[in-house]
Amino acid sequence: MVRRKAKKESFFVPILFGLLIVIGFGFTYKHFENKIEVNQRTGCPISNVDQRSALSLLLDSSEPYTPVQMSNIVNRIQNKVNSLKSYDRLRIYTIGVAEEELLVPHFDFCKPDPESAESPLMRNWKAGNFEQRLRDTLGLMQGSRDNSHIITSIGSVASELPDSYDERTIIIVSDLVENSNIGSMYSPNWQEALSDRNSLLDARRPMLGGIRIEILFAPRANAGIDFRRVRDWWRTFLSDSGGMVANIDPISG
């Protein structure tokens, strides 16, 4: 009896070993099939085939926001970032001079994949690093500048969003008061002045090419400015520049 049992066990050992090999091969194949090669600095896919959606934030730091405005803006942005999928690209810029050189993003990372083939420790570190850098960068909104080159800044940001992305969105956080060599909306006759400088305005016009535009419109306490007129001008200007203006949401407080 003992001898027959040994023969029976020896018969099933190769079968069990073969099943383990098949299962192991399946896990290995799935691992490499789902693995996306990424840039080690940004965490973004190297191959254009793996490029997903791209979201760029353009923050106006020309004047401080109120605490209520700041809280509302950060919450809105955080909700938008939370809705991004793995490997979607997020860039954050502040409005600046972009006539000779492109703006450099303060934040340029892709959202980490919580189900990547990396170790759990590495996945958790990347997720935490992404969130911490995001919080630190949003603090750059609180600043003070004499000028506000919004038009050329939008053009710079748009130039970094090629149509190889499935979806492209720019969120502008600003009071939308242009104050540059193109024109100053602090002037009571700013609209007429911009019309007189139409050739310069066209030369600086951003090429939006179907990019989705969302605006968190945060007027500051600037006496003598008709913000409704400012808002309406921007809606027309961005649409004429090829942008898909989805919404202009007021941020009060």
Give the ranges of each region predicted by the language model.
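Von Willebrand factor
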Residues: 48-166, 169-172
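VWA/integrin I-like adhesion module and closely mimicked acidic/polar interface patches used
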Residues: 177-231
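N-terminal post-signal-peptidase region of extra-cytosolic proteins
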Residues: 72-79, 155, 193-201
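Acidic/histidine-rich, surface-exposed loop or edge segments in extracytoplasmic proteins
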Residues: 50-64, 133-140, 214-219
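Hydrophobic beta-strand segments of well-ordered beta-sheets in folded domains
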Residues: 53-57, 87-92, 168-170, 205-219, ...
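Acidic, polar low-complexity linker/tail segments
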Residues: 3-56, 62-69
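Von Willebrand factor A/integrin I-like adhesion domains
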Residues: 221, 225-253
